[in-house]
Amino acid sequence: MLTIVMGAPCSGKSTYIREHAAPGDIVIDFDVLAQALGSPDPHDHSKAIRMVAIDMRRTAIASAIQQHANGATVWIVDINPGERMPAYRRAGAQFVTMTATPAELHARASAERPERWHGLINEHLVREAKAAAPTPSRRRNRNASGTC
């Protein structure tokens, strides 16, 4: 099983995986990787650690998808899967989207995260709203004969 857990920052993605993953499952969570690299804080990492964690995560995701094909159970936290979606779909991933109101997200950020997380939440919500907005369709005018 390959499960991609998505949602805004502070929506409960890591908590969901902690509650559902079994011992021995592969779990890819950026903050966990950053802490493994030496970050003293679970949610506030130096630039150097962030850069290494980004590279590690990219490699880990590709490897985990291959291990999933070999029968491993894989959980991936992915706030913004974008370009990775086709690979996830080809691998037969299931998707879980964590939701919370903006007020809940900001309350959690105030309780557990550095101040800059409020901006990250707002950026995510704007990106999500743009993705959900209907796109205007183009209309073609035809004359009575059906030609343009």
What do these predicted regions represent?
Residues 2:
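Walker A (P-loop) ATP-phosphate-binding motif of ABC ATPase nucleotide-binding domains
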